[in-house]
Regions:
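Low-complexity, intrinsically disordered extramembrane tails and loops of integral membrane proteins
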Residues: 1-43
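Perimembrane helix-loop junctions in membrane proteins
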Residues: 31, 58, 89-93, 128-132, ...
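Selected alpha-helical membrane-embedding segments in polytopic membrane proteins
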Residues: 34-136
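Hydrophobic alpha-helical transmembrane segments of polytopic
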Residues: 74-78, 145, 176, 208-211
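Alpha-helical membrane-inserting segments
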Residues: 80-89, 115, 119-127, 151-159, ...
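Generic alpha-helical transmembrane segments
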Residues: 107-121, 145-153, 176-181
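Transmembrane alpha-helical segments of multi-pass membrane proteins
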Residues: 138-152, 206-209
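Terminal transmembrane helical module of multi-pass membrane proteins
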Residues: 156-225
Length: 225
């Protein structure tokens, strides 16, 4: 009986968080000043690279709406980068069936970054029962940890000028992926409020396991998160 009540509470909590997040995204988009906020986002990224762990901890502790705005801008950049890359990678289109297939491929590649952030954020929200944080804060920190991957996606656009450039972009993407994993580890450690690596590493492994199960499910739909 208690277990059913707990599941019910968790479900309601998840619904409330989702509703709050959607409303906050709408408000954030309405209040975006593209020029001003773009400059501030650049400064935010620069500060992150100067002191990544300190900046991540600051985001988790302060739960500042301004950081959420930066995260939205960063995510939009990621989506646009993937959109450009996919549009140029689509081959010649012959007939309506090819058009539909190519269009679907572009859409799936474009929504992949959003799905990636949301999946990881929801997993963390559900598994983090002791040190509760809002979904918007989790989305902000998870997006921040993925900034190296965003940079890699932007750099990968260069391959539209020639496939030989991939000899540079592929190793760079791998490097960015490794940096992102390290940032994600310390991001989740800060969210979970763990001090000792020996205690947190098991939780991190479990979070990653659940994420990669989700990855397999999404990949069956040709969405690679």
């Amino acid at each position: 009986m208690e277990e059913k009540e707990e599941k019910k509470v968790n479900t309601e909590e998840l619904k409330n968080e989702a509703s709050t997040t959607v409303n906050q995204v709408k408000d954030t988009i309405k209040n975006v000043d593209i020029k001003k906020d773009s400059i501030e986002t650049k400064g935010f990224i620069a500060e992150l690279f100067k002191d990544p762990l300190g900046k991540i901890k600051e985001i988790v502790d302060k739960e500042n709406n301004q950081y959420f705005k930066y995260a939205i801008i960063i995510l939009v950049i990621w989506v646009v980068a993937e959109l450009i890359s996919r549009c140029f990678s689509v081959g010649p289109i012959w007939g309506l069936s090819s058009l539909g297939s190519s269009l679907m491929s572009v859409i799936k590649a474009t929504i992949a970054p959003i799905c990636s952030i949301l999946v990881m954020s929801i997993i963390v929200l559900v598994m983090n029962s002791k040190n509760k944080k809002s979904l918007t804060t989790i989305i902000t920190t998870v997006t921040t940890a993925n900034i190296p991957l965003v940079i890699a996606s932007v750099v990968s656009i260069l391959t539209i000028f020639g496939s030989s450039i991939s000899t540079i972009t592929i190793p760079f993407t791998r490097l960015c992926s490794a940096v992102s994993i390290v940032l994600m580890y310390f991001t989740l450690k800060s969210i979970f409020g763990e001090e000792k690596n020996s205690e947190f590493i098991k939780k991190f492994a479990l979070v990653e396991l659940v994420y990669y199960i989700a990855y397999i499910v999404f990949s069956l739909l040709n969405i690679y998160i």
